[in-house]
Amino acid sequence: MSKEKEVLLNEEIRADEIRCVGDDGKVYGIISSDEALEIANRLGLDLVMIAADAKPPVCKIMDYGKFRYQQEKKQKEAKKKQKVIDIKEIKLSVKIAQNDINYKVKHALEFLEQGKHVRFRVFLKGREMATPEAGVVLLEKIWTMIENEANRDKEPNFEGRYVNMLVTPKKA
């Protein structure tokens, strides 16, 4: 069964009795599916099963093509309104030089201007694991350079061999 054919319509409805509602909101009550199909054909519309789990099943007399079009339109609108959060990651080490920090901060500011989130990751190697505070100090130093352009989403925290900090762009 294809994804589009999730609803039963017209002759596919096998229930003996159904609760029928018209396209204009008129309630036909509990009638046989043959009778409902006859009403739908007379009006030039389709009989569409709305709630198969109900006792008796609920069907609606409507234009199925128009209904499907409206459903697809709603899905497209919902998809447009979804905002994908893009997170850029900038990797650093504890022994990074100041000019390299400036270069990485410049890139981070470009990402923030584009509306992207930035995660700073300080990788701790070997003996640096004994003093992870050095990573926190480095991230605090970077934070002082970008605090006018960004909001700190997460304080510097430890995750395994990394010290992470997440920053987001300031709202205009």
From Swiss-Prot:
Annotated signal peptide: none
Q: Does the keyword Cytoplasm apply?
A: yes
Report if keyword Nucleotidyltransferase is assigned. Answer: no
Q: Name one GO biological process term.
A: ribosome disassembly
| One function term, GO molecular function aspect | ribosome binding
UniProt xrefs under SUPFAM superfamilies: Translation initiation factor IF3, C-terminal domain, Translation initiation factor IF3, N-terminal domain
Check the record and name the InterPro entries matching this protein: T_IF-3_C_sf, T_IF-3_N_sf, Translation_initiation_fac3_CS, Translation_initiation_fac_3, Translation_initiation_fac_3_C, Translation_initiation_fac_3_N
Q: Which domain of life is it from?
A: Bacteria
Would you name any one GO CC term? Answer: cytosol
Q: Where in the cell is it found?
A: Cytoplasm
Chief localisation class: cytoplasm
Record key words, sorted = Cytoplasm, Initiation factor, Protein biosynthesis
Q: What does this protein do?
A: IF-3 binds to the 30S ribosomal subunit and shifts the equilibrium between 70S ribosomes and their 50S and 30S subunits in favor of the free subunits, thus enhancing the availability of 30S subunits on which protein synthesis initiation begins.
Q: How does it assemble?
A: Monomer.
Family, according to the entry, reads as follows: Belongs to the IF-3 family.
Provide the protein name.
Translation initiation factor IF-3
Q: Which organism is it from?
A: Campylobacter jejuni subsp. doylei (strain ATCC BAA-1458 / RM4099 / 269.97)
The gene name reads: infC
